[in-house]
């Protein structure tokens, strides 16, 4: 508290709070750019509906078995790497209407590098490969009827409505097939790198973490 000039009122509740504060401070000089693309209520509601966490699921064909001599690996600093190397929405989202909501046009927008967030309806949804180890769609993130699930993941459904980003849609199209796919609503934005001021904060935290790990009391990057 003394080092950062905090009081009980301003003290971040978690370690992430310090990172958020540094990011906000770095972006303060261009706050007008950030404020100009903030979503309105309708856009925010669709973004929240499309939000999902990490993709973790047990293979239903391996349940109850003890596997010997298995291996695993961890990708170091995966989230910062994505922020540093990928493009993200950098403009206000624009709603599509009319013919633009046809799936062929949605796919064209994605091919041209646009961020697309939409709500899709799948009729006769089913896995392309019935032995798919990690089905992507979670029942809790959809409105589905006459469905078959494995520990919360959809294997099939007569009707399934769900909100997806363009990244999610590509995964769903790769894993599932359907008799019919329709887009109820969708919005698009141009993608580009995150602001340099924000990326500089990411770089600093990564460098600090790496120095600590490689120090005399830390672990090396290979051990991380």
Model-derived features: where do they sit?
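Conserved acidic
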Residues: 1-224
